[in-house]
A protein has these predicted regions:
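A short beta-strand-turn-helix
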Residues: 20, 28-49, 72
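Thiol/disulfide oxidoreductase modules built on the thioredoxin-like
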Residues: 96-103, 109-158
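Structural microenvironment flanking redox-active thiols in thiol-disulfide oxidoreductases
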Residues: 62-101, 111-118
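Conserved hydrophobic packing residues within short motifs/helices of P-loop NTPase cores
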Residues: 51, 83-85, 128
Length: 159
């Protein structure tokens, strides 16, 4: 009995849960960016994409933001796209944070948690590396650092 309760209580990882799997098509993301523009992940087909679930109240999220800005510029010739999905924090705080860091990529609001649920997010930050064909290649739970970015990006950067 105790083992059954312990198994139910253990933390989930994205690979433990049905509905999303490395090697499968990434779930659709259709929504509105914080600046009011419509967004559809399908419009980025043909580009390597990083989908990052974040919020300005999350310290590791704040710490990885400069890395995403740096890598987006470094891989511009590859067509790299970054998409933020705002989790839990309010849009006004997120807009101020984005302006402070000079982030140029779109952030989509997820007020109902539908996107978070489709991606089986277990915490923030959490990043999904999607190849040019819309296939999920890697999932990173926790802060993406310089030391792991190269491997994660290599999984989606080949034509």
């Amino acid at each position: 009995m105790i083992l059954a309760v312990a198994a139910l209580a253990r933390p989930k990882t994205p690979g433990d849960q049905p509905g999303i799997a490395v090697g499968s098509a990434a779930p659709a993301i259709i929504g509105t960016t914080l600046d009011g523009a419509p967004f559809d992940l399908a419009s980025l087909r043909g580009h390597p994409v990083i989908v990052n679930f974040w919020g300005p109240g999350c310290v590791p999220c704040r710490d990885e933001f400069p890395l995403f800005k740096q890598e987006l510029a470094a891989h511009a010739a590859d067509g790299l796209a970054v998409v933020g999905i705002l989790m839990y924090d309010g849009p006004d705080d997120a807009r101020a944070f984005i302006a402070h860091y000079g982030a140029t990529w779109p952030t989509v609001g997820d007020p109902t948690g539908a996107i978070r649920t489709a991606y089986r997010v277990v915490g923030r930050p959490q990043s999904y590396f999607i190849d040019r064909n819309g296939i999920l290649r890697k999932i990173s739970v926790g802060q993406v650092t310089d030391s792991v970015f190269t491997d994660l990006y290599a999984s989606i950067s080949t034509p």
